[in-house]
Amino acid sequence: MIKLKKSIALSESGFIFDPTTGDSYSVNQTGSKIIEYLKEGLSEDQIIDKLNDTFDSDKELMQKDLDDFLQHLKQLKMIENV
């Protein structure tokens, strides 16, 4: 299971803010949805299902994009594997 740091804030326009570091980032609509789903506590499989419901895309491509995005968030120390 992947856990987003509780302190992470997401604006409606797609800005992510980490108040512990003061860092902020801009994400696209897909990234914004992923952050939203992580905040809800959804699993990777649930996130993929929701993304496929929202965006008409190949499930394998969506999985790769999710994996890449989660790896990036991990490098930024915004998520942790539980």
Set out the residue ranges of the language-model regions.
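Acidic, low-complexity/disordered tracts enriched in E/D and polar residues
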Residues: 1-32, 36-39, 82
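Long, charge-rich, low-complexity alpha-helical segments
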Residues: 26-82
